[in-house]
Regions:
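Soluble cytosolic regulatory domains appended to membrane proteins
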Residues: 11-178
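Short, low-complexity N-terminal regulatory "tails/caps" that precede and couple sensory modules
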Residues: 1-13
């Protein structure tokens, strides 16, 4: 009984729900900012989420085809305002790699049409299962210095893509790009 009474007044949480309750109380008493509280909640929540929960689905992907000429794909790249693009072969399940928009700058800056080789420009695509937990994925992004991963289902078919920005937005909220 003495231990129970001591625990009652110790002020230390014994589990995550108690911790969240204490943090909520601290925010209500203005000891921490609401934005900080939301980030803490987000950071704790990412370990419960999976790549499938936040990925850009297959149907919404903006891709470049391996055999396309720059004149054919540049308008799409510019209009989309994305910085990375999956490069496909025959279909969306045949991902050859990732094309970075910054690697296309010489094509945009030179009206004469700089020499471009898709094969030399694409980078290997990181591949993750739909079930990958976001906290693990974030660590892999950091460790491998990747910003985008191809998400595949249990049959190895493309489900979508997920970016480091998608994961970070789960922690800090919406990130507005210019």
């Amino acid at each position: 009984m003495r231990e129970w009474i001591g625990d009652l007044f110790s002020g230390e949480p014994d589990n995550v729900p108690e911790l969240l309750e204490m943090l909520q109380d601290a925010a209500e008493r203005q000891l921490i900012e609401v934005d900080a509280l939301n980030m803490i909640f987000g950071a704790l929540h990412v370990s419960d989420m999976h790549a499938r929960d936040i990925m850009i689905p297959r149907s919404a992907l903006v891709v470049v085809q391996e055999d396309q000429q720059p004149a054919d794909f540049l308008p799409t790249v510019i209009e989309s305002r994305h910085s990375r693009f999956p490069v496909t072969g025959d279909d969306l399940d045949d991902i050859k790699g990732i094309l970075h928009a910054k690697d296309l700058l010489p094509l945009v800056l030179q009206e004469s049409g700089a020499r471009f080789s898709m094969k030399d420009s694409i980078r290997p695509a990181a591949v993750v299962p739909e079930s990958k937990r976001l906290n693990v994925l974030l660590e892999e992004f950091r460790t491998n210095r990747n910003h985008m991963a191809l998400v595949v289902d249990e049959y190895g078919q493309t489900s979508g893509v997920v970016t480091i920005e998608d994961v970070l937005e789960q922690i800090v909220g919406e990130i507005e790009d210019e």
